A protein has these predicted regions:
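Active-site pocket-lining/capping segments in soluble small-molecule metabolic enzymes
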Residues: 1-151, 157-300
Length: 300
């Protein structure tokens, strides 16, 4: 069934609090700036020092109540990125991570969720925080379509984020049922090398670091890794999902959930993601001016 609204799942629940504090009033007060076919499905992230964290190292100085007040004010679902792949039973007693889950579980308004990798954690959250929905993390690196399909069929998960390399296997995606399509959340702006063979190891090192293990940072194996993340480079990825792709291919096919990555990047770049995916081109300058751009700003 063709979808009429695309929902974006945005990075930086804690990491980019100040950005959303400035952006969300514009989202509410100037809907004419925004494409009329899109909305915010959730904002995801984790603060620093969360042993359940994964994907990226969390950051941000704002407390959970402050963050949840902002999300509640705008009726937006909050998601904790707790996608550590190496959790053991003894880690489940962590006070900070449990307190965060309790805050989201007890929050009134929009339902909130947790992005998970570990089945141990998934079972624990279902038992102790039943109001939270679960999202299967892309850190599972499910590159085989049948493995991904089995994940989609699991009743535990409200959403499943496939590996980005499955973004455009349209001959298989089109065969999903409407219920299955509603669960799929595509990662749009991945800059990782399409041929990467070390992605799972990259995520595992982050999991170890979040657990406090002393291990070196992952060394990226991409041919051009020295340039870091560039949005222009991500756009050249063969499985990059553009605004046109969303409107002309995915929504007509029945898909409506799209994840924007960027927790480990700078807020200026995340703003560019928001502008590209949500704001009509003629209004992008207005949003920049509302947030940071004035007639006295120097860059040199």
């Amino acid at each position: 069934m063709r979808k009429t609204i695309a929902y974006y799942h945005l990075p930086g629940l804690f990491e980019f609090y100040e950005l959303y504090e400035a952006f969300l009033p514009i989202y509410r007060e100037h809907r004419e700036y925004f494409y009329d076919w899109c909305g915010i499905g959730s904002i995801y992230g984790a603060p620093a020092d969360c042993i359940w964290g994964g994907g990226r190292i969390g950051s941000g100085e704002h407390g959970v109540q402050e963050v949840m007040n902002l999300m509640s004010e705008y009726g937006i679902s909050a998601r904790l990125t707790f996608s550590n792949s190496l959790l053991r039973e003894e880690h489940l007693a962590d006070e900070k991570c449990n307190a965060l889950c309790k805050a989201l579980n007890d929050s009134e308004g929009s339902s909130n969720g947790v992005i998970v990798h570990s089945d141990i954690l998934a079972r624990y959250i279902k038992k102790h925080y039943p109001n939270l929905y679960l999202v299967s993390s892309t850190t599972k690196v499910l590159t085989d379509f049948n493995d991904f399909l089995n994940e989609v069929k699991r009743e535990d998960f409200q959403y499943v984020v496939p590996d980005f390399r499955l973004n455009k296997v349209f001959d298989k995606l089109v065969k999903l049922t409407d219920k299955e399509k509603d669960k799929v959340e595509f990662l749009c702006n991945e800059c990782c090398w399409f041929g990467c063979y070390d992605r799972k190891n990259c995520y595992e090192i982050v999991s170890r670091q979040n657990l406090g293990e002393d291990c070196p940072d992952h060394v990226c194996v991409a041919p051009d890794s020295q340039s870091g993340y560039r949005f222009s480079k991500a756009m050249e990825n063969p499985v990059f999902i553009s605004v046109g792709d969303i409107r002309n291919t995915y929504m007509p096919m029945g898909f409506s959930n799209f994840k924007i990555e960027g927790r480990g990047l700078g807020s200026a770049l995340v703003l560019e993601f928001l502008l590209y995916y949500m704001i009509k081109p003629e209004y992008q300058i207005h949003v920049r001016e509302d947030i940071y751009l004035d007639n006295m700003l120097d860059i040199f």
